[in-house]
Amino acid sequence: MLDLKFVRDHFAEAEQRLATRGGAVDLSAFTDLDARRRTLLGESESLKAEKNQVSALIGKTKDKSQVQGEIARMKDVSVRIKELDEELKQVEGDLRTLLMTLPNLPHEDCPVGTSEDDNKEVRRWGQVPEFDFEAQSHWDIGERLDILDFERAGKLAGARFAIYKGAGARLERALINFMLDLHTGEHKYVEILPPLMVNRDTMTGTGQLPKFESDLFHLDDPDFFLIPTAEVPVTNIHRDEILADGDLPVCYAAYTPCFRKEAGSHGRDTRGLIRMHQFNKVELVKFARPEESDQELLKLLDNAEEVLRRLKLPYRVVDLCTGDIGFSAARTFDIEVWLPGQQTFREISSCSNFRDFQARRAAIRFRREEKGKPELVHTLNGSGLAVGRTLVAILENYQQEDGSVVIPEALRPYMGGVEKISA
C-alpha cells in the first residue's frame, strides 16, 4: 500500500510514476477523500478541544445554574463530535480501500516502458546448445520416456495438470532438495514449510487481495485461499510484528506447491509444464533495512541464478520495465532460461523488491534502537526456482539424439547416481 503522506505531499510525482505503468491514472478520488478526511479531522479535534476546555470550566463552577447554557451547548457538541467521528471512520475506510487498489510506485531505476518489449536485457550466462538433430519439446520427451503423463492427468483433473512418473517424479524431487540444500546451506536462508491455505488478511498483506481475488482458488467454508506462491504465507509470518534491527536481513527459503487459475492465459502454453494450475516452487523471501534493500535484491537475484549455473543451464537476466512489473513490486529482475524445444528464453524466476509496499499493508516493522520509533521494513522475494520449469529446461537442454536425457552432474547425488534417463 502506498504511503498516504507521500502521495499527498508529492502528488504530481506519484501520479506521474504510476502513469508509467501504463494508462492514465486519475487520483482525483484520492484528493477528494483526503481533503474530506482532513476537514473532518480538523473539525472533530477542534470541537474536542473546546469541549475539554468548557467542561473544565463547568467543573470549576460551583453554581451550575450559571452554566446551564454551556452544559446544553456541550451536549450538542458531543452529538456533533460523534457524527464527525462516524463520518471520519467511513472516509478513512474508503481511503484505505482506494489505496489498496493502487499499485506500487516503480523504482527510480526501473526502465520506463509499456510492455515486455521495453524490458532491458542485463546479461547472459552459458552457451546455448547446438544439436545435430531437431530439438524436441519437453512434453514429447517426457511422454516418450514415460516420465510425464498429461493425458491421465487430464482425466483426473482437467487441463493444465501433469502426472510425474518414475524418473520424472524423482527428478522433480531431486530439484527441490538440491535447491533447498543450496539456499539453506551455502546461501544461509532459513527453511520454512508454511500452510498451503491462508486467510484474507494474509492474501491482503502481500497484495493479492482485493484486486486479484478472481485469479485465486478460493474455499468458501472456511474462507481460505490456496496460495499462488510461498511469498504469501512466508512474508506474512511477521505481519503485525516489530523485528529487531540486529536480526536484519531475515532470509527464508520455502518449498511449496502453488495454485493458480491462470485465468488470463487462455490459449497460451496449453501443452506441457510451462503454465499449470498446480506446480512446485522454491521461494526466497527477505526482510531488509530500507537503505539495504536494493543491494539485497541483487544478492537474492544472484542466489537464484546460482541454481542455473550449478545445473549449467543457459539463461539471461532481464530488468522489467514499468509497464511489466507486478502490482506490488517496485523493481523486478526476471531470469529466463533457454528452451531449445521452443527456441526462446522463458521466465523461470522473478526477483522483486517491494520496498515498504507490502510491509505497510501487513504492518511489518523494525526498530533500530531499543527505544527507537519503529520503521517499516522492505520486503523482497524471488523464485529460487520454479521447479517444473527447471525440469523442462533440463529435459530440453540435456536431450540426446537417441531420445535419452543426461542428468546434470549437480543433481546426480540426488538421483542415486543415475546419469541418464532412457526409455
UniProtKB/Swiss-Prot annotation:
EC number assigned by the record: 6.1.1.11
Pfam family, one: tRNA-synt_2b
Record: residues binding ATP: 260-262, 347-350
Domain of life: Bacteria
Enzyme class: ligase
PANTHER family noted in UniProt: SERINE--TRNA LIGASE, SERYL-TRNA SYNTHETASE
UniProt record similarity statement: Belongs to the class-II aminoacyl-tRNA synthetase family. Type-1 seryl-tRNA synthetase subfamily.
Functional note: Catalyzes the attachment of serine to tRNA(Ser). Is also able to aminoacylate tRNA(Sec) with serine, to form the misacylated tRNA L-seryl-tRNA(Sec), which will be further converted into selenocysteinyl-tRNA(Sec).
Free-text comment on this protein's domains from its UniProt entry: Consists of two distinct domains, a catalytic core and a N-terminal extension that is involved in tRNA binding.
Protein name: Serine--tRNA ligase
